[in-house]
Amino acid sequence: MVHLTTLLCKAYRGGHLTIRLALGGCTNRPFYRIVAAHNKCPRDGRFVEQLGSYDPLPNSHGEKLVALNLDRIRHWIGCGAHLSKPMEKLLGLAGFFPLHPMMITNAERLRRKRAREVLLASQKTDAEATDTEATET
């Protein structure tokens, strides 16, 4: 008996399986399904299996929600499925893969930039406070 997964895992003519994001939702309210699909199929078209979901807009608690079926993702990667760049980043943030070095570098740059902005803002308020004290006396 031939298993269905072996048929799906074999490279079909003209492409391979890819784990990627399929756009859903409506205008100004995106929602993504994480799917295993053939790379030649359209972004929102037919897929082999849905592996999770991703809501990029923060909820009332400021959280972006991601649901992943890591066992099935591991299965499809074992079958030879490729990952899209956004999925590599998402799985890196989830701890499934190591983070890309540029993500770490960008986070450090952003942290330094925000610290510098806070420092400049505090210096500006201190300077304004001393100016108002000098004019009052």
Swiss-Prot record:
The keyword DNA repair does not apply. Its main location: mitochondrion. Keywords: Mitochondrion, Phosphoprotein, Primary mitochondrial disease, Ribonucleoprotein, Ribosomal protein, Transit peptide. Belongs to the bacterial ribosomal protein bS16 family. It comes from Homo sapiens (Human). The lineage of its organism: Eukaryota, Metazoa, Chordata, Craniata, Vertebrata. It is linked to Combined oxidative phosphorylation deficiency 2: A mitochondrial disease resulting in fatal neonatal metabolic acidosis with agenesis of the corpus callosum. This is Small ribosomal subunit protein bS16m. HAMAP family: Ribosomal_bS16. The modification Phosphothreonine is found at residue 130. GO terms for molecular function: structural constituent of ribosome. NCBIfam families: S16 (TIGR00002). The gene is MRPS16. One of its GO terms (biological process) is mitochondrial translation. It is found in: Mitochondrion. The keyword Cell cycle does not apply.
